[in-house]
């Protein structure tokens, strides 16, 4: 989904950067506050950031000017919410643009909005909704959350490209074309990413449940159940 350097007109680059900025700025404040309150969250936060970096670096060529890959943001969205995830995603995208030529600096705002903001926000809403029912375990909830974050990211990227490159004057036709091409790779990738994130989440519950409990992600009863499965 990383839109490459120079692929978007400067006006759209500025638009997406301005739109993304408030989310990231608030996310920095929220992240700083959380760390000041309890520094024990730092290792898990770092793991989530590294997870985003590694998964989103596994790119597969796709639409001209972009690519397909997992996003890794669903896990962070589930654990820390969308604002902190927007900061982690921005850091990852900046490093990838500078060190891996993956994405770009002029298109950073557009890539941040799709992968670090839109995907995590919708995914977080899904996660919260599923968990509030009291009937969906953390493994299944994280699986769905990760898959949704992936698919929403590419839906937004399709829209971003369609706004700039309409097909026969039609943004809708362009959106359908871009989304259709992305779907070939992203649907399987979203499922795989969901499985990986679910396994990682359950592993963290087994080895470091107190952090997730403090974050309000999981309660003692479910912790005991998951840890019992590992015996």
From Swiss-Prot:
Question: Looking at the record's lineage, which domain of life comes first?
Answer: Archaea
Pfam families to which the protein is assigned, alphabetical: CbiM (PF01891)
The protein's location, in the record's own words, is:
Cell membrane
How does the protein's chain sit in the membrane according to the entry? Answer: Multi-pass membrane protein
Keywords tagged on the record = Cell membrane, Cobalamin biosynthesis, Cobalt, Cobalt transport, Ion transport, Membrane, Transmembrane, Transmembrane helix, Transport
Q: Name one GO cellular component term.
A: ATP-binding cassette (ABC) transporter complex
- TM regions (residue ranges): 8-28, 41-61, 75-95, 108-128, 136-156, 176-196
Annotated pathway, please? Cofactor biosynthesis; adenosylcobalamin biosynthesis
Q: InterPro entries given for it?
A: CbiM, CbiM/NikMN
**Sample GO molecular function, one term:** cobalt ion transmembrane transporter activity
Q: Name one GO biological process term.
A: cobalamin biosynthetic process
Family named by the database record: Belongs to the CbiM family.
Function description: Part of the energy-coupling factor (ECF) transporter complex CbiMNOQ involved in cobalt import.
Q: How does it assemble?
A: Forms an energy-coupling factor (ECF) transporter complex composed of an ATP-binding protein (A component, CbiO), a transmembrane protein (T component, CbiQ) and 2 possible substrate-capture proteins (S components, CbiM and CbiN) of unknown stoichimetry.
NCBIfam families under this entry? cbiM, PRK08319.1
This protein is called Putative cobalt transport protein CbiM 2
Q: Which organism is it from?
A: Methanocorpusculum labreanum (strain ATCC 43576 / DSM 4855 / Z)
Gene behind this protein: cbiM2
